[in-house]
From Swiss-Prot:
Lineage: Eukaryota, Metazoa, Chordata, Craniata, Vertebrata
The protein's assembly and partners: Interacts with WASL and WASP, and this interaction results in cytoplasmic relocation of these two proteins along actin filaments. Interacts with NCK2 resulting in the localization to sites of focal adhesions. No interaction was seen with WASF2 and WASF3.
A Pfam family reported for this protein in Swiss-Prot or TrEMBL: WH2
Main localisation: cytoplasm
Record domain WH2: where: 36-53
Designated name of the protein: WAS/WASL-interacting protein family member 2
Organism: Homo sapiens
Length: 440
């Protein structure tokens, strides 16, 4: 029994060399196999390469020779363009109208030949082959080879047939799209008329809902020089209304009280009669235009009133919010920028102004004199660009009819007294760390 145990340990060491030997022997066998496999693979690869080259030459020769044989009289320019057609369908469409123009010369020859160049219909290549055979038998014999795969592609001929129709359609469409730009141009000329009248309504006509952003863009362009220059740019259009508004406060109320009706009579005074129908399209929207020249003074008259008034018109509770309006207005301005709901303001404007339209004239009279309050837009201007804020203020103020300062209750008198802050006292007495655990 003690004898058998010693022999097992010696066999243990030999196995690693046996593994090494096996590893060395296996690659020898695999090398022989690899040599045989390599020879077969090389032969196969050589054969495939030769076949690929021959196929490429066979396929390319007839495609290039067809246009050459058919368009020999037409010139090499057609041959150079037709391969582009094969690469790009747009080129084929461009070539087909040329074929249609020259179709009077050869109806069966050229258009059918151009189509096969663009991977076109299978039925037509035989026609091209028929036209090519009298020219060159070699071309026809070579052409039959590519035509067979093309015939095997029925979907492509179907596509090519609609392409022929689409080519004609594209012809009409190519001729048609230019007319729409003139149509747009035709639509554009009426806009320049309103552009002369007021640059904002032009966008209003094009886009009913987004007019307000459009108006904001225009005042931004008009307003960037400064709020006072904002008045002069509309003034060329509203030269009569601007000075009249400054000299006579009553005109603003007509704009504000009945937004729809007075604009009709006021518009002929501002501009020529033929543009009246265009104005009826944007009666409510043109009110902001003239009001812009007049609206900035009321804000200037009382910036706090504007700040307090902007929240009230939606809520219709100005006196309640008049006490501490200044913080909310910036939020409302941002909200108006994010989502300017022009239609509701117009509805609100149309429904509310009769009640609010009467009081505004006194503020317009009072503010016409003092223009110092433009600093509030400057405050926002530090946050944002001054020009955009000014233009936005002009547009936003023009939408709403604000209550005069007289309507709001007088603010409480300010009494100076020392205010005790518990946080500071606690920090001084106990220190900051013990307080949070007590609060928690």
């Amino acid at each position: 029994m003690p004898i058998p145990p010693p022999p097992p340990p010696p066999p243990g060491p030999p196995p690693p060399p046996t593994f090494h030997q096996a590893n060395t022997e296996q690659p020898k066998l695999s090398r022989d196999e690899q040599r045989g496999r390599g020879a077969l693979l090389q032969d196969i690869c050589k054969g495939t390469k030769l076949k690929k080259v021959t196929n490429i030459n066979d396929r390319s020769a007839p495609i290039l020779e067809k246009p050459k044989g058919s368009s020999g009289g037409y010139g090499s320019g057609g041959a150079a363009l037709q391969p582009k057609g094969g690469l790009f369908q747009g080129g084929v469409l461009k070539l087909r109208p040329v074929g249609a123009k020259d179709g009077s010369e050869n109806l069966a020859g050229k258009p059918a030949l151009q189509i096969p160049s663009s991977r076109a219909a299978a039925p037509r290549p035989p026609v091209s082959a028929a036209s090519g055979r009298p020219q060159d038998d070699t071309d026809s014999s070579r052409a039959s080879l590519p035509e067979l795969p093309r015939m095997q592609r029925p979907s492509l001929p179907d596509l090519s047939r609609p392409n022929t129709t689409s080519s004609t359609g594209m012809k009409h469409s190519s001729s048609a799209p230019p007319p729409p730009p003139p149509g747009r141009r035709a639509n554009a000329p009426p806009t320049p008329l309103p552009m002369h009248s007021s640059k904002a309504p032009a966008y209003n006509r094009e886009k009913p809902l987004p007019p307000t952003p459009g108006q904001r863009l225009h005042p931004g362009r008009e307003g960037p020089p400064a709020p006072p220059p904002v008045k002069p740019p509309p003034s060329p259009v509203n030269i009569r209304t601007g000075p009249s508004g400054q000299s006579l406060a009553p005109p603003p109320p007509p704009y504000r009280q009945p937004p729809g009706v007075p604009n009709g009579p006021s518009s002929p005074t501002n501009e020529s009669a033929p543009e009246l129908p265009q104005r009826h399209n944007s009666l409510h929207r043109k009110t902001p235009g003239p009001v812009r020249g007049l609206a900035p003074p009321p804000p200037t008259s009382a910036s706090p009133s504007l700040l307090s008034n902007r929240p009230p018109p939606p809520a219709r509770d100005p006196p309640s919010r008049g006490a501490a309006p200044p913080p909310p207005p910036p939020v409302i301005r941002n909200g108006a920028r994010d989502a300017p709901p022009p239609p509701p303001p117009y509805r609100m404007h149309g429904s509310e102004p009769p009640s609010r339209g009467k009081p505004p004239p006194p503020p317009s009279r009072t503010p016409a004199g003092p223009p110092p309050p433009p600093p509030p837009p400057l405050r926002n201007g530090h946050r944002d660009s001054i020009t955009t804020v000014r233009s936005f203020l002009d547009d936003f103020e023009s939408k709403y009819s604000f209550h005069p300062v007289e309507d709001f209750p007088a603010p409480e008198e300010y009494k100076h007294f020392q205010r005790i802050y518990p946080s500071k006292t606690n920090r001084a007495a106990r220190g900051a760390p013990p307080l949070p655990p007590i609060l928690r």
